[in-house]
């Protein structure tokens, strides 16, 4: 049989294919209901594409428990009939499961080369660009999208990804135009709105950004929880650009923290917002204990340095010294492993960024500056997007200032704000 995009799938059950199509459509749109694939996996244990999509669902979880469950679905496929594309996807997902992220994205790019209609695999690859560092991988991401334009030129989900790839390459004119086109085709498109929010923040178009994102909130609440949280985080950042901490915290309480506090995306967005507020406006001491309770187990896991840097900062701010030391010990062990991911990012960059985040959270900003000095040129390889990695740019700036390295700080501030209309936040960070 064929799925909704004309791709061959190994089953004769139209209902199973419909379940797989439903998952693909919802994940592409970042919609609610993707978890329905888990019931589908129980109903069709012998259908490979359903098991592969169930594994995909769990791999997005980025926790040890989620990985264990993903492995069950991947192992189930070993005994199932699969066509060539399904076997290729199985291999790519197994590489992702093994934290072999660069090889996983290479495998997914190969799939979309042979089967350009496979837009879901493009979406999964987009997430792996995030794991590998979206700004760092931006040119590669954009090349991937350009290769597929002929097959998906009018697809709003493809256009949303294309807009984001353009933004990551600092082509803000193209990013904005493509995001607006995607929203014109499908207004309920949180990823296109996300790409647009990146453009507006990067250019310092704060008033316009606030208007656009506020207007999108009612629709956003009907989308999947991760993008609801994350697009709301961008709204809070726009409030922070105006140093409106009260408004940013209203968004924090209503849309970001405390709804699904064990979700990784909610944890990272909550930590990042509070961390930025602390650098701009002052301590947020009361917020850290509740976050620490939820993240302490996660801090021992090592999926990508970007995550661990957030976790150790939050634990340090909560005063959980033993948890910080345990997390740092796990990170150090990860950084001296001999696998490709350890050698690609953990040892040369990730370890220093995580150590610096812990030092910064504990108040030792001079040490944070010294740790970050040699690795900032490669910082974007630790994971996250350009907007997310601005957190570490601001941390480095504040560390330089606290260390009394004022000339270095002034030069760095100018470098990271070039081309942006200066906002109240920028003026606060400059001092």
Place the predicted regions along the sequence by residue:
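Inter-helical turn/loop elements of alpha-helical hairpins
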Residues: 12-17, 22-46, 51-86, 91-102, ...
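Generic helix N-cap/helix-start motif at coil->alpha-helix transitions
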Residues: 13-19, 45-49, 82-88, 115-122, ...
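Residue at a conserved register position within TPR or TPR-like alpha-solenoid repeats
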Residues: 26-27, 58, 95, 125-132, ...
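Structural motif corresponding to the intra-repeat A-B loop/turn of tetratricopeptide repeats
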Residues: 30, 61, 98-99, 132-135, ...
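Alpha-helical repeat scaffolds
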Residues: 33-40, 66-79, 102-112, 136-150, ...
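Well-ordered mid-protein domain cores that form the structural environment of catalytic cofactors
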Residues: 78-163, 168-172
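Internal metal/ion-chelating core segments
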Residues: 143-242
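Helix-coil-helix junctions within alpha-helical repeat/solenoid scaffolds
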Residues: 237-431
């Amino acid at each position: 049989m064929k799925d909704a995009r004309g791709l061959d799938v190994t089953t004769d059950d139209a209902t199973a294919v419909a379940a797989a199509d439903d998952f693909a459509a919802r994940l592409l749109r970042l919609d609610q209901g993707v978890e329905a694939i888990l019931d589908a996996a129980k109903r069709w244990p012998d259908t490979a594409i359903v098991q592969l999509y169930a594994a995909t669902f769990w791999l997005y979880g980025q926790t040890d428990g989620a990985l264990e469950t993903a492995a069950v679905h991947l192992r189930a496929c070993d005994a199932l009939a699969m066509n060539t594309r399904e076997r290729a996807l199985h291999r790519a997902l197994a590489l992702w499961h093994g934290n072999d992220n660069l090889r996983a994205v290479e495998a997914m790019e190969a799939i979309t080369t042979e089967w350009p209609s496979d837009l879901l695999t493009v979406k999964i690859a987009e997430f792996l660009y995030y794991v590998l560092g979206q700004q760092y991988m931006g040119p590669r991401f954009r090349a991937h999208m350009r290769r597929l334009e002929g097959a998906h030129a009018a697809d709003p989900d493809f256009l949303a990804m294309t807009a984001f790839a353009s933004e990551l390459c600092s082509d803000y004119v193209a990013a904005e135009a493509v995001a607006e086109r995607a929203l014109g085709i499908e207004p309920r498109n949180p990823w296109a709105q996300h790409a647009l929010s990146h453009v507006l923040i990067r250019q310092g178009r704060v008033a316009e950004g606030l208007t656009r994102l506020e207007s999108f909130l009612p629709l956003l609440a009907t989308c999947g929880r991760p993008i609801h949280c994350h697009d709301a985080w961008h709204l809070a950042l726009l409030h922070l650009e105006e140093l409106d901490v009260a408004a940013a915290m209203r968004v924090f309480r209503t849309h970001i923290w405390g709804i699904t506090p064990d979700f990784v995306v909610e944890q990272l967005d909550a930590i990042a917002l509070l961390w930025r507020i602390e650098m701009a406006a002052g301590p947020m001491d009361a917020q850290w204990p509740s976050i620490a309770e939820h993240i302490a187990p996660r801090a021992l896991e090592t999926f990508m340095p970007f995550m661990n840097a957030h976790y150790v900062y939050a634990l340090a701010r909560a005063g959980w010294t033993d948890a910080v030391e345990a997390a740092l010990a796990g990170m150090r062990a990860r950084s001296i492993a001999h696998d490709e991911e350890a050698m690609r990012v953990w040892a040369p960059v990730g370890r220093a960024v995580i150590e610096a985040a812990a030092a910064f959270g504990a108040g030792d900003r001079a040490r944070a500056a010294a740790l970050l000095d040699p690795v900032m040129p490669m910082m974007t390889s630790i994971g996250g997007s350009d907007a997310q990695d601005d957190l570490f740019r601001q941390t480095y700036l504040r560390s330089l200032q606290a260390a009394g390295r004022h000339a270095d700080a002034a030069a760095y501030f100018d470098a990271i704000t070039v081309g942006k209309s200066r906002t109240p936040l920028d003026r606060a960070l400059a001092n």
